[in-house]
Amino acid sequence: MRRFILSIAFGLAASSVHAADWDRFLQAVFGAAAAKDGSVCYARVYDAGHLAANKAQRIRDVAIKLTLRTENGERRLDHNVVTHLVGSRQKYWSGGQCGDYRGLVARCFVEGDGGAADFTLDSDGKTLTARFDDFHIWRPQDAADETTMTFDKSPADKVAKLTKAPMSACAGVGD
């Protein structure tokens, strides 16, 4: 009986820590708007100098939209990513849900077992560092083509540091 009570107490403590981390992450991203549904955009466009100095990098630009929504009474955080590769006008995108929060870090997964990313915020939520882990992207222009590619194949594409941007920077990321 004592073990049972201890396991319940531990579970409740872990649940409240998880809820506190969820709240802290949402507060950093959305600020006062964390109480309602909405979206925020983070973006980065790599300039020619950066790309010349990092020849192994394939990612030319990246935008990440985080969307807080309520569905069937449950709140959730979705992510959508849009990117272009160096030398290509083709747009690629990806998306899924975030589900594990540790302080200012959210673990976010791509739908259909397409990898994951850790999104780490600075304390004021103005900068997001994305660490990609076998993160899959695909082409939205051709819905019939479900071919995916791994976003972070090159070690130079494993980490991206983005800044909060106007929602127009996330145009075309899907929803």
Model regions and ranges:
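N-terminal secretory signal peptides
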Residues: 20-97, 101
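Ser/Thr- (and often Asn-) enriched beta-sheet segments in non-cytosolic proteins
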Residues: 58, 63-67, 76-82, 107-109, ...
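Bacterial N-terminal signal peptides
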Residues: 7-13
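Surface-exposed, polar helix/loop patches in the mature regions of secreted/periplasmic/lumenal proteins
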Residues: 86-139
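Amphipathic/hydrophobic helical signal segments and adjacent flexible N-terminal regions
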Residues: 3, 16-56, 113-116, 131-175
